[in-house]
Amino acid sequence: MHYDFKEVERDVQEKWDFTVNVKDVQCYVLEMFPYPSGNIHMGHLRNYTIGDVIARYKRACGLHVFHPIGWDAFGLPAENAALSYNISPQVWTRKNIDNMRSQLKSIGLSYNWDKEFATCDAEYYKYEQEFFLDFLKYGLAYRKESLVNWDPVDQTVLANEQVIDGRGWRSGAIIEKRKLSQWFLKITDFAAELLDDLKSLNQWPEKVKLMQERWIGKSEGVIIDFQIVGINEVLQVFTTSPHTLFGASFIAVSFDHPILKYVNDVQLIQLIDSFDRKDLIDDSSINTVEKFGINSGLVAKHPLLDMDLPIYVANFVLMNYGTGAVFCCPAHDQRDFDFAKKYSLPIRQVIFPEQNVDLEREAYVGSGIMGCSGFLDGMTVDDAKKSMIEKLISLGICKKQVYYRLHDWGISRQRYWGCPIPIIYCKKCGIVPVDKKDLPITLPEDIDFTKSGNPLDNHPTWKYTKCPSCGADAKRETDTFDTFFESSWYFAAFCGIGKGIDKDVCNKLLPVDYYIGGIEHAVLHLLYSRFFCRALTRCGYFDVKEPFSSLITQGMVCHSTYLDKYGNYLFPEDGKKMIQEGKYVTVGRAEKMSKSKKNVVHLDDIIDKYGADSARLFILSDTPPERDIEWLDENIEGVSRYLNKLWKMIVDYDQIEQNFVFNDISNDAVEYRMNVHKILNDITNDLEFYRFNCAVAKFRELSNVISEMIRLSINHHVVSEAIYILIRVVEPFIPHIAEKLWQIVGGQGMLCNQLWPKVDSQLLIKKNVNIVVQVNGKFIKAVSVPNDIDDDTLKSIALEVAQRRIGNSSVKNIYIIPARVINIVITKSS
């Protein structure tokens, strides 16, 4: 008998109510909130189902759980939609939110819907405009002209974290370098703290912490003074490898380094001024952009040798890291090696390993013994580094210095669909912050997206205003915040009254106890959120340093790809049909679901065909949450069959008891109870450690145990207890069918409000153990004996069991491995 999942899900969802007073909350569960693109995809399903299992389990443990949801609603796709479909970003976004809200509710997620908001709500972004004004007040926001990452497709600036392998994180376009006046947040103020405090995040994946550690990028080194030949000027060079100074053959500086003002050759000046900024190299493009440079004509004196070093302008040196100048030892740095080879510069080896190295092919970057280095000869690299620093300090030309790879966060975006920056520009007063009483600065709705460039700057009236200081004509800032600004504090907004921040509630609820989302946000959203907590604490909004206590990063949902003979992607159903028709089709590997590869499985179709519980259970089965999962049609069908068997087994059992009595039950019944409570204990432990796939396997095992008990007519009190336990432990995973079965077996109240079943610890104590009997190491038989059996009795039993094998042989010795094995060693009679 198949259960009507549509009727069950509709009936149950109407009855659920997960409202909670935030002041009573004891556990805060949050998934990374979605961008309202229009539809919930399978990646969302996995993310939100994991969070829902945790939230439902923690409620069952007796905690008041806060499990809110909102919408990360600003962003470029809304502008693209406005241009493509002639619809305003507001209308497009709200329509998508309505559809996705309906989808989320259909999954059966236990959200506190009364706390829902979208970041495009003016009452939400009013507060981040207020934050920005306070950041200005506390020296955490500033404006400057700087070299920025320009996305020529999206026509906007990107933060360093949004440039991946030299390309825009969203558009995929090759990023150019441009000089623009931008607003920045001073994340570097917290660089040391952000790095050091990673050690305290014991419940974060090590991989995420390592990614942040590398991104923050602490470099401990020294600044060395190089005298410029012919000029009374010193060039300061930062290095983490002072021990290679004897191998230096040139110096490289940034194209905008102040030392270049001393270049007198007109042609050289023109050449440097024409330096192509789009080819500048940072860590995100070190492997994709060719290294090149220009000989500036300037020369520096080597501080320890009677030789001069030419100074090159190089595209791999940036003014915003270190001092904007480096000395280069091509023999022991691959970047320097490539540059030296290109421009025929000397390559001097100063580190010698035991084996010979071929410096014609690549730099040697390993350890070894110093040579060709004067007073450093014969030293190890570590000793040489210390000695060189001591020497240079004694000469008065060196000081120790720490730099960070992390740069301040550029937050200006030349887009319409974002939060307006609350700044006014007055010719008389300069930069004037908007008064807090005049917030929020809202977006105009009559916007034209057909013109290129910044839509707000192109608006005929919006940017024109009066200076709040002098009353003169003035202009608004037409850039908007980077959308990561919104997602960097939303977890605190859920704690507030309205959409602001309630300090007392935030101090109580934060950090979020369980935060679930993709690892792709390790150095974007997660790092920015950590910064925001510190910045808002400095401004007095609350006293919280870390936003998330426990972080769970789920893998992707993948699906096979199908290609025709021309290499065009096919929809899976079309590919399978063509294969059946004998046509040429290549079945590719399973890849992340994407529209471009046509391997997307639509959630609405799955729920309509199999139900929400089937979708939830599939997405949590078989695979640990941190690993990728492959979508297979046969697996979702298998899950659906299990739910129907579960329904039939419980509905058909007509001996349900609600008050269990276990007096005078058989030994078999006791054994079954022990097994049931062992499985319950295993499921509980699996949930505590996020082993959701293991918990699923265990409750399916429990289903089989109950089925066997029913078949063998085991005491109905024992069976009833097992059924009640099963229904309760499956509820976090498959809440609709569980809630309905709870009603059918006579459960009181709503199942989602019932406590987790308690494990009877006495039933976990094994009264008997299985011991393997061996003769000369060969298996004879496994016997069940009391777990407190003494050795002499055990030996007697073993000898009796093995008598036939022993025969007339002599027993030489008997070895016992407690609770596991007894081995009888015999010798043949002469």
Swiss-Prot record:
Any single Gene Ontology cellular-component annotation: cytosol
Binding-site residues, ATP: 595
Localisation per UniProt entry: Cytoplasm
Reaction equations catalysed: tRNA(Leu) + L-leucine + ATP = L-leucyl-tRNA(Leu) + AMP + diphosphate
Motif mapping: 'HIGH' region: 34-44
Principal subcellular localization: cytoplasm
Cystine residue pairs: none
Pfam families cross-referenced by the UniProt entry: Anticodon_1, tRNA-synt_1, tRNA-synt_1_2, tRNA-synt_1g
Span of the annotated motif 'KMSKS' region: 592-596
EC id: 6.1.1.4
Highest taxon in the source lineage: Bacteria
Molecular function per GO: aminoacyl-tRNA deacylase activity; ATP binding; leucine-tRNA ligase activity
Swiss-Prot/TrEMBL keywords: Aminoacyl-tRNA synthetase, ATP-binding, Cytoplasm, Ligase, Nucleotide-binding, Protein biosynthesis
Enzymatic class: ligase
Family annotation (HAMAP family): Leu_tRNA_synth_B
Family, per entry: Belongs to the class-I aminoacyl-tRNA synthetase family.
Protein name in the entry: Leucine--tRNA ligase
Native organism: Ehrlichia ruminantium (strain Gardel)
Phylogenetic classification of the source organism: Bacteria, Pseudomonadati, Pseudomonadota, Alphaproteobacteria, Rickettsiales
Name of encoding gene: leuS
